[in-house]
Amino acid sequence: MRRFCVVPLLLVLVEAAQKSDLGGDASAALINHSPMLIQRLQDLFHKGNSTDTILRIRTANSDEVKVIHVHQLLLTLQSDIFDGLLLNQSEVTLQEPAECAALFEKFIRYFYCGEISVNLNQAIPLHRLANKYHMTALQRGVTEYMKTHFSSESAQGHVVSWYHYALRMGDINLQESCLKFLAWNLSTIMSSNEWVTVSDKLMVSLLQRSDLVLQSELELFSAVEEWISKNKPDAPVIEKVLRSIRYPMISPSQLFQIQKESAVLASYHNSVQDLMFQAFQFHSASPLHFAKYFDVNCSMFVPRNYLSPSWGSQWIINNPARDDRSLTFQTQLGPSNHDTSKKMTWNALFSPRWLPVSLRPVYSESIPSSSQSNRLEEGKPRLVVTSAMSGMDFAGVTFQKTLLVGVKRQQSKVFVKHVYNVHQSTDEVFDFLLQADLQKRTSEYLIDNSLHLHIIIKPIYHSLIKAK
C-alpha cells in the first residue's frame, strides 16, 4: 500500500506568506506547526464540527445513500468542479459507480489532510475520482503509483485492466507504460489469469510489436490459440491475430506440428496459407538467396526478444559494482533452418564505472589520489558485445544486440524493467542503468546483490538486389 502526501493549497499559501515575512533578517526564524494544523483539520472532518455542506453519494441500481458532512471552503479551494457544484448550494447529490462510492469518504478526507493510502484494487476508482473532480496532483500521484506497481502480485492480475482503463480515459502516457510492461514480460502474462482478459484491440497491438519478451514464437502461437479458444473473437480479429504470428521464426518441424494439431489453424488455414508457405520457403534456402526473391524488410522476418538459449544468454552478475566482468556465449547464426546449426561466438564485457579515454584521470604524483579516485567514481555502467569470430562477413544481415535488465523478483520471477537495443555498445544509448546505483545493496536493480541481465542476438535481414 502506498500513501500520497500533498500539502493542501491553504498550507502552501500560508507557508509562502511566512517565508516572505522573514525577509533578509538573519536573526529571524520560522516556527512551523503545519502538522498540528493538518491534524486539527482531520479532527474537524472526523467530528463533523461546523460543517456547512452535505454530500449525498448515490450508486446506480442501489437505494443506499452515503451522507458526508463537509466544509465547503476546503473543497472549493482545491477543486473547480466542486466550486461549480456547490455554488449557492448547501446540499448536493452525486452519482458514482459502486467502486468509487466505496472510496468517496476516503477521497474527501484527502481534501483535509493531503494524504491518502492506495492499493492495487483502489487505483482505478481513485484515479477516476481525481480525474472527475479535477484533482490534478492526486491524479498524477495515482498514475505514478500504477507505473511503479506493475510487477506487484495480485490474484487476478491488474496491468491489463489498467491498460483498458487508460484507453477509456484517453491517458496516452499510462497506456504506453502498461503496453511496455506487458510486452517486456509477455511470457509471465501469458501464463497468468490476466491473459484471457486481454481485449481484441490490446491483442492486436501487442502482436504488432517486435519488443515482445517471450521464450519463442511457438510459445506465443500456443498462447494466442488459447486466447482465441476462450474468448471466441469475431472472424476478422482471429484472422488479423493469426497473420501477426511470425511463422518464419518457428522451425519447420514445429510448423508441421501446429499445422497438424492446431484446431484454430485448421479452421483458418486459408487465412494464413500464404504466410505458412513463405515460412517454409524461408527455411528451405539461405537467407541471402531468399532475400534475392522476397522482401525481407518486413516485420515477419524480424525476430522478437526470444529467451531460449539459441538466441542469447542470461547473465547474472554478483556484486556488479566491484569490477569488470566478461562472458562468452554462443547463438545460432539465424532462425532459418539453413543457419540454425551454425554457431556464432560472442564476447560480452560489463564495466560498472566506465569512462571515455578523454575523461580518464592521468595518474601523476602532482595530482592528489583522492581526485583521481573521484574521477573514476564518476564513470557509468557500460556493456559491450562483440563477435569473437573476427573477419567474418555476412552479406545482407546485421546483428542487433538487445539487452534486458530485470528487477523485483516476486515468487521467483524476474520482471524486465528496461530493454536496450544496440549495435555493439551501450555507449549508443544515454540511459543504460542510469538510475541503478549498483553500489547500494538496496537498489531495486539488485536481486540478492546480483544484477540480472539477458543478452539477445537478433539477426536483422536486409534486401539485396533482386533476381530477375
UniProtKB/Swiss-Prot annotation:
What InterPro entries does the annotation carry? BACK, BTB-POZ/Galectin-3-binding, BTB/POZ_dom, SKP1/BTB/POZ_sf, TRAF_BTBD17
Q: What subcellular locations does the record give? A: Secreted
Alphabetically sorted, this entry's keywords are: Secreted, Signal
Q: What is its main location?
A: secreted
Q: Which positions fall inside the BTB domain? A: 51-120
SUPFAM superfamilies in the record: POZ domain
Superkingdom to which the source organism belongs: Eukaryota
- Membrane-crossing segments per the record: none
| All residue ranges annotated as the BACK domain in the record | 159-259
Signal peptide: which range, if any?
1-16
This entry carries the following GO cellular component terms, namely: extracellular region
Query: What is the protein named?
Result: BTB/POZ domain-containing protein 17
To which species is this protein native?
Xenopus tropicalis
Gene label: btbd17
